[in-house]
Amino acid sequence: MKKTLGLVALILLIVLSCFYFFTKQPKNIFDEIYQETEKTYQTNNILRNIDGFDIKPVWPSDGEFLRYTPSGNYKNLPEGYLELRIGFSFYSEDEIGSISFEKSIESNVNIKMWTIYSHKDRTLKKSVKIGLKKADTETYIEDEAQVKSYLEQYGITTKDLNSYYDEIVNQKVLKDWCSIYDSKYSPSNYGDVKVETQWENW
């Protein structure tokens, strides 16, 4: 009887271990980036291996606010782009990773695009804002009607927005990721992730 119970317990332990291992495996390319960065960001951040990517100099940090929110910027950008940042929030209530970049459309007008990945929901949300610079300050317009109005004013279509996203997120960030990590996924095959695009039906 004891042997039978022991065998059942062992089988149950193996099944639970396999289930735990399976649920913890990255389900998409953004999961990979999130999980691998979470493992390494306080010691030797894996993103340091990307050529031209600069980890924010305060890292690693024990500060309460900064401790779980690492970020970094690309030093070299394609022509016409002003900033490309990768950031995370490893707080349990957040569990997100983000890729944001700005593209100049006029001297004081920029397009700001955000890609926010929720590790909890496996959801990727793509959004766009308009940045207006005045002196040393920059304000962002988020209201959809106003954003669309600015885009129309400068002749920027949803096809253009998709092109900017592809050039930066797919052809740069995700390609760089695949060059430093043996990914199961690719820029053309994200894996199991729900993508929500703000401008999809504009």
Where are each of the predicted segments found?
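Extracytoplasmic electrostatic interaction patches
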Residues: P70-W202
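A sequence-composition feature that detects small, non-aromatic residues
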Residues: T4, A9, T43, A135, ...
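Hydrophobic membrane-insertion alpha-helices, especially the h-region
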Residues: T4-F22
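N-terminal export/targeting and maturation segments
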Residues: C18-N110
